Amino acid sequence: MGSVNGPLRVGIGGPVGAGKTTLTAELARAMGQAYSVAVITNDIYTSEDAEFLLRAQVLPAERIRGVETGGCPHTAIREDASINLAAIAEFRTRLPDLDVIFIESGGDNLAATFSPELADLTIYVIDTAAGQDIPRKKGPGLTRSDLLIVNKVDLAPHVGVDVAQLEADTRAARGRRAYVMGSLREGRGVPEIVQFIKEVGGL
C-alpha cells in the first residue's frame, strides 16, 4: 500500500526488560500479513534486539535494521535522531510501499520520550514485576505516550502486586490517555494494541 505521506512511524519505549522487543515482535507478526512493515531497533553497543527478531523470523531480514547508538540511548530518539532518520530514509528507498515502521528504543528510564520528528505515534511499556509504584512515578514516557502498556500482569501474584490497584494508579497517571493491561508473551493485549495503532495511526 504505502501512504503519500510515507509510512506511519511508531516509537516503542520503556525500561530495560519491560518487554519492548516482545511487543515489537508481536506487532510485526500481527500486522505483517496485512501491511508492509519494517523494524528499527536501537541498542547501545550491539544489535542484540535486531538479532532476536531475525531469529524469531517475525519479518524477512531486509525489513529489520539494528542501529548502535553508543552512549545514552535516549539521545538517538530525542535530541539527535539522525541515525534513526537515516535508517527510515534507507527503508523508504528500498521498500517504497512501507505502511508502518516500528522504532524500538534502547532500554531507558521513565523520562525517555521520542522526538516528534521521529515518531508519529508513541507506545511506552512498563513491567508489572518492577513494582506496585511504577505508575505513581509519572515519568514523561509513562504519562505522555499515546499508548501505555502495563506488561506482565500475569506475574503480579508472584511479585506482590495488586493488579486492581496497579490499574487504578495507571488510570490516574494517564488521565484520558489510552492504556492496555497485558501479558505480551501470552499475546494478551496484542489485539487491542493493533486496533489502537490502526485507528489512531489512520491505517
Swiss-Prot record:
Highest rank taxon of the organism: Bacteria
One GO BP annotation of this record: urea catabolic process
Molecular-function GO term, any one: GTP binding
Record: residues binding GTP: 14-21
Keywords: Chaperone, Cytoplasm, GTP-binding, Nickel insertion, Nucleotide-binding
Pfam (any one): cobW
GO CC annotation terms, alphabetical: cytoplasm
Subcellular location: Cytoplasm
Classification via InterPro entries: CobW/HypB/UreG_nucleotide-bd, P-loop_NTPase, UreG
Signal peptide: none
NCBIfam families per the UniProt record, alphabetical: ureG
Known partners and oligomeric status: Homodimer. UreD, UreF and UreG form a complex that acts as a GTP-hydrolysis-dependent molecular chaperone, activating the urease apoprotein by helping to assemble the nickel containing metallocenter of UreC. The UreE protein probably delivers the nickel.
Similarity field: Belongs to the SIMIBI class G3E GTPase family. UreG subfamily.
Function according to Swiss-Prot or TrEMBL: Facilitates the functional incorporation of the urease nickel metallocenter. This process requires GTP hydrolysis, probably effectuated by UreG.
Protein name, as recorded: Urease accessory protein UreG
Gene giving rise to this polypeptide: ureG
